[in-house]
């Protein structure tokens, strides 16, 4: 008698399928977690030149494998279904620290899928320079290159940096870079943020600056740049932040600056700029912070600055301004801080300042102002030590406020009670502590949408 072979039931087939599927998935994960040998060898060499962990190669033979990833390294699966390094971060916790003998690894520019590099406080003991390998990979995918606070990173910015055509964020701040800014940088049409601040760069700002049509943030502050502000700056229509402070720039602010309609922050302090402001400066309707202390301007204060409705901070100290304080400044309803100290301003203080709801800092000291201080006791108490009118011999205080004010830098009208120092208001409550950290407010409020716009890493810094 022939026995018929029993067919597996549908339920047993389903069980078998569910049993073997995870095995295939695990095999798929193992494949996707592997890295091309040449790329893994490059990564090992980078880690050996940078990391203080000398056992890194043995401890992480496959750094992209699930469960084996290391802080500071991110991997992505490429179109070849293999894993590739997409991000390298060194120097700031929880990322790996750098060893004292670390030197700049030029081989990072040979990683074909690398999108972001961040080296913070890595090169601190031995001099090193930004180097490029002889042979570069075509069509580099690098979008962010940030080298910050590296006191031993010196030398010139290499023109070959212009080969990184996908670069959107270039931050080389707080290093010891020297020489001219290479014009080749301004061929990087994808750049949205360029920060070369706090170096020792010299020479002029290249005219090619105007090629960066997508630029949103530009910071060249704290260098030794000379020459004039290039007129091509007017072509940066998307610019939101401009910081050229603490250089040796001279001449006038170019007329074309009025075309920067998206500008929120402009700092030009500590230069040699002089002459009249552009008449069209009132077109900067998005401007919130204008910092321009310590320039030999020697002109009257521009009335047009009073027509900037979003202006929150205006600093024009120590610049030789003369004439009266424009009445238009009392119409700046969003103004929180105004400093016109150490100029040659004359006339009376406009009375409208006390009606500005957000003002908490007002410095008109060391001028030639005259007349009765036009502020009532409530305004004096509100500003407290954030109000400085000292050094104006022609000013006097209303006698009605004599008993609410102590240690004043302004005489009471008709009396001689000057005791020197700034204006200080008596109050039974504890005096509020002054805070002048205005720029942080700008980055938190004005540049947060900009950070979202970039769509890259949240680590980059304006």
Swiss-Prot record:
The lineage of its organism: Eukaryota, Viridiplantae, Streptophyta, Embryophyta, Tracheophyta. Its main location: membrane. It is found in: Cell membrane. The chain crosses the membrane at residues 442-462. It comes from Arabidopsis thaliana. SMART domains: LRR_TYP. The keyword Cell membrane applies. Belongs to the RLP family. Residues 1-26 form the signal peptide. This is Receptor like protein 29. It is a single-pass type I membrane protein.
């Amino acid at each position: 008698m022939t026995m018929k072979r029993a067919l597996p039931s549908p339920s047993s087939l389903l069980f078998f399928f569910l049993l073997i599927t995870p095995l295939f998935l695990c095999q798929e994960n193992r494949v996707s977690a592997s890295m091309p040998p040449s790329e893994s060898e490059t990564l090992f060499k980078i880690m050996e030149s940078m990391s203080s962990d000398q056992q890194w190669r043995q401890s992480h033979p496959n750094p992209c494998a699930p469960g084996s990833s290391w802080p500071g390294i991110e991997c992505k699966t490429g179109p070849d279904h293999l894993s590739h390094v997409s991000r390298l971060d060194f120097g700031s916790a929880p990322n790996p620290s750098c060893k004292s003998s670390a030197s700049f690894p030029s081989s990072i520019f040979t990683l074909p899928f690398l999108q972001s590099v961040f080296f913070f406080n890595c090169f601190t003991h031995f001099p090193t320079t930004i180097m490029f390998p002889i042979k570069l990979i075509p069509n580099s995918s690098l979008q962010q290159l940030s080298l910050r606070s590296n006191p031993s990173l010196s030398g010139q910015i290499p023109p070959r940096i212009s080969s990184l055509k996908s670069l959107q964020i270039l931050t080389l701040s707080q290093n010891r870079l020297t020489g001219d800014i290479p014009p080749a940088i301004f061929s990087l049409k994808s750049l949205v943020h360029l920060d070369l601040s706090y170096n020792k760069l010299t020479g002029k700002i290249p005219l090619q600056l105007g090629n960066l049509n997508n630029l949103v943030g530009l910071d060249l502050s704290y260098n030794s740049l000379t020459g004039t502000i290039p007129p091509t700056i007017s072509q940066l229509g998307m610019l939101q932040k401009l910081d050229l402070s603490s250089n040796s720039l001279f001449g006038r602010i170019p007329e074309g600056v009025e075309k920067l309609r998206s500008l929120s922050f402009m700092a030009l302090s500590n230069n040699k700029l002089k002459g009249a402001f552009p008449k069209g400066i009132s077109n900067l309707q998005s401007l919130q912070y204008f910092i321009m202390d310590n320039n030999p301007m020697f002109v009257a204060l521009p009335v047009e600055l009073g027509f900037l409705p979003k202006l929150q901070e205006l600093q024009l100290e120590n610049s030789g301004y003369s004439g009266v304080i424009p009445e238009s400044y009392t119409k700046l309803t969003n103004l929180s801080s105004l400093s016109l100290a150490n100029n040659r301003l004359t006339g009376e203080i406009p009375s409208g300042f006390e009606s500005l709801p957000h003002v908490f800092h007002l410095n008109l000291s060391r001028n030639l102002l005259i007349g009765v201080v036009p502020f009532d006791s409530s305004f004096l108490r509100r500003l407290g030590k954030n109000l400085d009118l000292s050094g104006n011999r022609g000013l006097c205080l209303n006698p009605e406020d004599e008993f609410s004010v102590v240690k004043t830098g302004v005489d009471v009208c008709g009396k001689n009670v000057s005791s020197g120092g700034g204006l200080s208001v008596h109050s039974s409550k504890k005096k509020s502590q002054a805070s002048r950290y205005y720029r942080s407010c700008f980055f938190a409020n004005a540049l947060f949408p900009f950070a979202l716009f970039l769509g890259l890493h949240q680590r980059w810094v304006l």
